[in-house]
């Protein structure tokens, strides 16, 4: 069963809030901007990490220096999973913050 639009938006809101909280609780120097459903993380080296919602597809898209990734929400595991690799969103974010920010942050519940 696919996600309702309301549930989808609630889930993406929660992800973006959690991501912001992780960055707020670290000493990593980043600028955060959340506008129009798009969360942009700017690292001090000029690279960006962008989390954007794709409501028509009920997906969460992540753009990073290493590429673009599309995530579907899995109700069984209650996790966002990459539609190409099956990687958990939290694993990808940890890897990307290491690659782009030089610090592997923990995004455990994503």
Curated annotation (Swiss-Prot):
Signal peptide: none annotated. Coiled coil: none annotated. It comes from the Bacteria. Pfam families: Frataxin_Cyay. One of its GO terms (cellular component) is cytosol. GO terms for biological process: iron-sulfur cluster assembly. PANTHER family: FRATAXIN (PTHR16821), FRATAXIN, MITOCHONDRIAL (PTHR16821:SF2). This is Iron-sulfur cluster assembly protein CyaY. It comes from Stutzerimonas stutzeri (strain A1501).
């Amino acid at each position: 069963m696919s996600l309702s639009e309301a549930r989808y938006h609630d889930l993406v809101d929660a992800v973006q809030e959690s991501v912001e909280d992780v960055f707020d609780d670290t000493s990593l120097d980043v600028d955060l901007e959340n506008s129009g459903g798009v969360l942009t993380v700017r690292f001090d080296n000029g690279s960006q990490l962008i989390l954007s919602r794709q409501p028509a597809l009920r997906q969460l898209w992540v753009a990073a220096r290493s590429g673009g990734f599309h995530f579907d929400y899995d109700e069984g595991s209650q996790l966002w999973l990459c539609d190409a690799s099956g990687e958990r969103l939290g694993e990808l974010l940890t890897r990307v913050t290491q690659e782009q920010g030089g610090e592997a942050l923990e995004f455990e519940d994503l």
